[in-house]
Amino acid sequence: MAKVRTKDVMEQFHLELISGEEGINRPITMSDLSRPGIEIAGYFTYYPRERVQLLGKTELSFFDQLPEEDKKQRMKSLCTDVTPAIILSRDMPIPPELVEASEQNGVPVLRSPLKTTRLSSRLTNFLESRLAPTTAIHGVLVDIYGVGVLITGKSGVGKSETALELVKRGHRLVADDCVEIRQEDQDTLVGNAPDLIEHLLEIRGLGIINVMTLFGAGAVRSNKRITIVMDLELWEQGKQYDRLGLEEEKMKIIDTEITKLTIPVRPGRNLAVIIEVAAMNFRLKRMGLNAAEQFTNKLADVIEDGEQDE
């Protein structure tokens, strides 16, 4: 899991630092935010102190009505040694009790001009993206007709050469050799290339080429949601391969299962065209058009008609 610090959030959203500067390197370990309204009312039994605290007009207007002694005590309880930051929305005035408590405990107090709900959604999306579970897979990721296709297989089977042919046919390369994958949601996997090898493609006998330089900016993209895996393997004599496409194989990446197709490789097979058509067929299946099922139904009808004629 990637590390996010308060400083990263401050720079990403151009937040104004009010106090507690010594704590800007505190780690943020979860994407959930806290609106500490009930805590300001005095109930701290289940206070999620490890979350980023977000104060809006509702919380601060209630806080203004508290007695002076209660104000100091509530802010001291709000600013703990593990609280990453306290953020105020709408450029609202900062209570002096909050500034004092934040300086004592080193909790950064930040301010944003955004409305509370808008700031909350943006913060949550940013943290979920940065804190998502990640992994790396040896393969090639290509955007084919809007379908994110992860091409896997043993080294030397022809993944990069296939990707090069797909790029020449107008599709877009995302990553070659190493694909960094993060799970942004329960069923959403997004892949990208490591910074070091972004836009690069390695072809045996040719070396490393820069796809963006050779084919233009339209031939690459920085990231893509992965929707199907195509595993290339050398053709094994006697092994039974799927010839109808009725059964779907699944592959688990992190906690998400996605469709996997095994494509046998042998001389004379145009892998780029096969993968291209497989991506198009996958889109058709998602639209409810399954050629294999239609063929099976027609075959069953023909057999049934033949039995009736007898």
UniProtKB/Swiss-Prot annotation:
Keyword terms:
ATP-binding, Carbohydrate metabolism, Kinase, Magnesium, Metal-binding, Multifunctional enzyme, Nucleotide-binding, Serine/threonine-protein kinase, Transferase
Gene3D superfamilies according to UniProt: HprK N-terminal domain-like (3.40.1390.20), P-loop containing nucleotide triphosphate hydrolases (3.40.50.300)
Q: What gene is it encoded by?
A: hprK
Q: Where is this region: Important for the catalytic mechanism of both phosphorylation and dephosphorylation?
A: 201-210
- Tell me the domain comment: The Walker A ATP-binding motif also binds Pi and PPi.
Q: What else is known?
A: Both phosphorylation and phosphorolysis are carried out by the same active site and suggest a common mechanism for both reactions.
The record's Gene Ontology biological-process terms are: regulation of carbohydrate metabolic process
Q: Which organism is it from?
A: Bacillus velezensis (strain DSM 23117 / BGSC 10A6 / LMG 26770 / FZB42) (Bacillus amyloliquefaciens subsp. plantarum)
Supply the name of the protein.
HPr kinase/phosphorylase
| Assembly and binders | Homohexamer.
**What the protein does?**
Catalyzes the ATP- as well as the pyrophosphate-dependent phosphorylation of a specific serine residue in HPr, a phosphocarrier protein of the phosphoenolpyruvate-dependent sugar phosphotransferase system (PTS). HprK/P also catalyzes the pyrophosphate-producing, inorganic phosphate-dependent dephosphorylation (phosphorolysis) of seryl-phosphorylated HPr (P-Ser-HPr).
The keyword Nucleotide-binding belongs to this UniProt entry's keyword annotation:
yes
- Which reactions fall under this protein's catalytic activity? [HPr protein]-L-serine + ATP = [HPr protein]-O-phospho-L-serine + ADP + H(+); [HPr protein]-O-phospho-L-serine + phosphate + H(+) = [HPr protein]-L-serine + diphosphate
What domain of life does the UniProt record list for this protein's source? Bacteria
Q: Where does ATP bind?
A: 153-160
Q: Which residues form the active site?
A: 138, 159, 177 (proton acceptor), 243
Q: Which GO terms describe its molecular function?
A: ATP binding; magnesium ion binding; phosphorelay sensor kinase activity; protein serine/threonine kinase activity; protein serine/threonine/tyrosine kinase activity
**Record-listed Mg(2+) binding positions:** 160, 202
Where do the segments described as Important for the catalytic mechanism of dephosphorylation lie?
A: 264-269
EC no.?
2.7.11.-, 2.7.4.-
